[in-house]
């Protein structure tokens, strides 16, 4: 080999070595798709990853590399006989490969078909006329953006986790941020008219869960499903409107900002503090009613529990199940009457947190055999006064005279003849009344059915 050839090879080797960082920095992510693109949910699909917590993903789009990044695709957890099309956060390496299956479990922050999960061989298609359609294995439509004929040019997953259909001018035609499910990511809004709805459980994703979070012109509210819904969290924001836009909340780095009477670029009406994010972060309304914030810290860690405030865990509607009494985190059924009669038993034996069941169910036709079981020194997580300026006897009689009433909750300050009465139509968990916190006296009277 000539000296010139050796020098040429040496130069090429030196050049490649010096520029190896440039080679490794080339983008390997796949954040967008053109029209007439389709993906099929099969075991052989590319970018499939099984995690040790039982979850599995088949990514269709992924944005970014090295660290926690957003991806979307098919997701399942558990038996994996049904799948969501979802946006989730995963851990990636410098080549945009999905890594850390033992700790970097996918965190779902949006889903399209939570009420209509699909099976193996389901397809996702970005059609030639601009519709994004999810079809189950049998060809039935599980979900669609309904954007056919709206000049869609392509699909993009943004760095903030927003799944966007855009037109030739790059303007948004449809975006997942306008259709929140049970979570918000930084920069995302929840606008009046929208709501977050908790899933039933970690593996039952349907929005038939008990809890919802919404914002309106009065503030931020969390409800448990009932008829009517019962609020277990209220953040009332006073003030006069300085904005013509609808009220909204926005998840920011360091706070949940409440734009109730204002809008950006102005200051929020109020904020709920959240620890500053050092990595990926998101907020989720979960199946137990908690609104938790999670952050990646070499594993997903809870960094805030936003609704657990002054009254603690016992203020959650189903912390002890229906009719059960929560006292310092312990659950128990209401005791016997003064005559020794028992009216409640544990719904699930040896599981007091699963609630209590009436031994004899209430019947409107048997109202003459109904009475009220007094449970002293307890209160309820919500109080929507049904009767004001009243006394305990009028409160009790109002419940006995109303078939739909399941309990009478009476409370007063210093004058028992001038109290308030709440008549819930459904009874969830009851809690001890800590007078040092509530500054009122409170008693519950549970409507029960005599057996004879």
Model regions and ranges:
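Beta-rich ligand-binding surfaces for carbohydrates and other polyanions
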Residues: 2-452
